[in-house]
A protein has these predicted regions:
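Positively charged, solvent-exposed patches that mediate nucleic-acid binding
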Residues: 1-98
Length: 98
């Protein structure tokens, strides 16, 4: 996904997507090297997964999605805003969702 997929960046995060041929999306949240402590990584991962959970029903299916976080500024509202903007940029929303 990192080498062949579509890469989009926004302040603090990058999104990589690649079609997977399945009937559902697979989501992974990962971090740059040296990103905070384990507690910070786990909190950021939980926030990212929750934000994705709230918008995944509006997305097209059949993609592998990787969110690479490299900013230690973290809040649910910021992550939701970032994911929404990145998915719009990647044209991953269903036509009915817009």
């Amino acid at each position: 996904v990192f080498k062949k997929g579509l890469k989009l960046s926004l302040n603090g995060v990058s999104l990589f997507t690649l079609p997977n041929g399945l009937e559902y999306n697979r989501f992974l949240c990962t971090f740059r090297r040296g990103f905070g402590s384990a507690v910070m990584r786990n909190r950021s991962r939980r926030i990212s997964k929750e934000a994705y959970r709230h918008i995944k029903h509006r997305l097209k299916t059949g993609n592998d999605i990787i969110l690479l976080v490299f900013s230690e500024k973290d809040s649910y509202s910021l992550r939701l805003e970032q994911l929404t903007a990145l998915f719009l940029k990647a044209k991953m929303y269903n036509d009915e969702a817009l």
